[in-house]
């Protein structure tokens, strides 16, 4: 009789992750905080605890004592497909890791499980499966011409050919949310900061591939990271500035892992850079905004990397800004709903989560809901529009530009 093959494997799960799967006590604390579980009407399969329990059951059926004695129990394909849907119905925001009393690094676990399933031909979710081929071919997720990477640059913005600082624009700011690129570049010019950009040599950071379990597919993610690092080195830069939280997280956390070495330059978010300049009294404001502003922590910037205070410091020092906090902030903030591929794969779920976050902002009576991530901004705008709410959604760097008397158009 032919030996049965287990329906799943554990090849890309680390020893620590295998122990983490066993360490879940099923206390349910994560269930209370999960944004997609709440937004879905409490669909059981989306609860972090449930996903861990099911994968543990799959492992027991495949590799437990009974499986070793009598062979693995086959897991129906339909069941694995349903599990795939639930694993991808997660923004990988990391709130479950924050509240987990067993200390499980759930973000890493969810991404590993996604990768595991994709390697078995199960997933990714919906149109996410096109990411490796298209990003590998076009070097950006929008399928636009790389030669247009700097098409947004207005005549008044000065860019050096080489400099110690590279502004890594990101695909979204460079192609879609141009106000973010206008604001960042003009603020740097206004402050006398010499910087350069990579232009058509700037490739996608790879975040979309990594977050959706496709980090391994054709080695595209590694190729992107390697190319970008070499392009930055060629500019002679020692520091790279990011206004996109997703690019920042990918560069700071994922690139070193993919390449197996530390980066030869410093990775800095624009709010960290501005905080330092404000503390050194190097910013001379020109305009009072006279607005009440609240701030949404992007998961990639906050929980994933730990940058919580710089955006708040910057906002609180802008003339005329009354800064107010929402109920859930910093480590315990509510995700905007766009991360982990959910915006692309399950847009209705992403919108529902965004509506909840916009309601948090409305409770503060703020004029402006700010963030430091173009993906958060886009989804929060969608949530606001869906609610027909009267609140401005804007990036922190755009508010800085306005207070310096600069145009973002």
UniProtKB/Swiss-Prot annotation:
Q: How is the cofactor bound?
A: Binds 2 [4Fe-4S] clusters per subunit.
* Reaction equations catalysed: methanophenazine + coenzyme B + coenzyme M = dihydromethanophenazine + coenzyme M-coenzyme B heterodisulfide
Any one GO MF term held by the record is: metal ion binding
Return the broad EC class.
Answer: oxidoreductase
Cite the binding residues for [4Fe-4S] cluster 2. Answer: 34, 90, 93, 96
Protein name, please?
Answer: Dihydromethanophenazine:CoB--CoM heterodisulfide reductase subunit D
Describe, as the record does, how this protein assembles with itself and its partners: The dihydromethanophenazine:CoB--CoM heterodisulfide reductase is composed of two subunits; HdrD and HdrE.
What phylogenetic lineage does the species belong to?
Archaea, Methanobacteriati, Methanobacteriota, Stenosarchaea group, Methanomicrobia
Q: Which cofactor does it need?
A: [4Fe-4S] cluster
> At which positions is [4Fe-4S] cluster 1 bound?
24, 27, 30, 100
Name all 4Fe-4S ferredoxin-type domain ranges.
Answer: 14-44, 81-110
Q: Which organism is it from?
A: Methanosarcina acetivorans (strain ATCC 35395 / DSM 2834 / JCM 12185 / C2A)
What gene is this protein translated from?
Answer: hdrD
